[in-house]
C-alpha cells in the first residue's frame, strides 16, 4: 500500500496514477472538506484528463482519508 499525503495539484494526480496502475492507494489530506469532496466522486480542480484518471482510480479502489495511515 502507498499512502500519498497531500491531495493538491501534485499529490492527487500522483495518487490517481498509482491507483490506476493497480497499486493499493490511500490518499490523505488534513482538509476534511477536500477529502469529503473526493469521496463524493468529485475532483477538486480542473486538469486535462484528470476526471478520466480519477474515475479509473476509483474503479480500482483508491481510498481517501483525512486521517493519516500506517503502512
Model-predicted regions and their roles:
Residues 1-71:
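Structural/interface elements that position substrates and couple domains in central-metabolism enzymes
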Amino acid at each position: 500500500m502507498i499512502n500519498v499525503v497531500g491531495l493538491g495539484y501534485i499529490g492527487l494526480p500522483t495518487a490517481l496514477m498509482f491507483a490506476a496502475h493497480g497499486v493499493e492507494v490511500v490518499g490523505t489530506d488534513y482538509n476534511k472538506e477536500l477529502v469529503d469532496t473526493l469521496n463524493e466522486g468529485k475532483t477538486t480542480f480542473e486538469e486535462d484528463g484528470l476526471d478520466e484518471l480519477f474515475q479509473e482510480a476509483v474503479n480500482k479502489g483508491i481510498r481517501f482519508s483525512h486521517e493519516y495511515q500506517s503502512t
